């Protein structure tokens, strides 16, 4: 890792770090149906980040040009084979929508509270900001692995279903959380992997003896 004031950074045209700039747009809706004990909330958003700071790929020297030769000497002097930098390398956009539905109802002698929350979000690469010095090295400056990590290494879908049943002093809590598929990439497409979505189940049983004493037993990730 080299800083942005180093000679390798100057030779590669890696600029000084500057502050990221972001623009946010958001809107929402909330509605209730009292007769059905139902409420709905929907929020949408778009976040544009300009000059986003990321870690570049690994640059190496060479023998083809004086610039490459100097980089090789500098790397050798630093006992390094490659160099990476933090840089304002990309512009990105994150867009998403959050939906929450809640419901309350009598069930037998007790009451059941139900909550369904879903998040659908995606981050996309809008532009790679390179200098003329980096012409031909764009795939190193921000490589394919970094792009996949940005766009699909975290779940783009998350759905959370919660049921909470209360009968006198007894409480039964159940939660299912679904995490959408994710990708793991290398710079070789043939080695890419996609991991399917996964559901995590939590279950607990609680009893309230008095205001100061309660007992709860349960399990997280019950089915794994």
Give, region by region, the residue ranges found by the protein language model.
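Outer-membrane beta-barrel architecture
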Residues: 16, 26-30, 41-43, 88, ...
């Amino acid at each position: 890792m080299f800083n942005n004031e180093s000679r390798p950074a100057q030779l590669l045209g890696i600029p000084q770090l500057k502050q990221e700039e972001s623009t946010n747009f958001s809107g929402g809706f909330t509605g209730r149906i009292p007769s059905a004990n139902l409420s709905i909330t929907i929020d949408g958003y778009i976040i544009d980040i300009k000059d986003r700071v990321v870690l570049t790929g690994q640059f190496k020297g060479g023998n083809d040009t004086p610039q490459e030769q100097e980089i090789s000497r500098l790397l050798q002097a630093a006992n390094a084979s490659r160099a990476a930098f933090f840089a304002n390398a990309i512009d990105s956009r994150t867009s998403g929508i959050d939906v929450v539905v809640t419901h309350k109802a009598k069930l037998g002698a007790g009451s059941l509270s139900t909550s369904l929350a879903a998040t659908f979000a995606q981050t996309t690469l809008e532009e790679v900001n390179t200098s003329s010095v980096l012409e031909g090295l764009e795939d190193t400056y921000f490589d394919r692995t970094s792009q996949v990590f940005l766009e699909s290494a975290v779940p783009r879908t998350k759905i959370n279903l919660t049921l909470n049943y209360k009968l006198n002093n007894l409480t039964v809590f159940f939660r299912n959380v679904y995490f959408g598929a994710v990708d793991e990439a290398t710079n070789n497409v043939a080695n890419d992997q996609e991991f399917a979505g996964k559901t995590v189940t939590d279950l607990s049983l609680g009893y309230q003896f008095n205001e100061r004493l309660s007992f709860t037993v349960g399990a997280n990730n019950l089915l794994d």
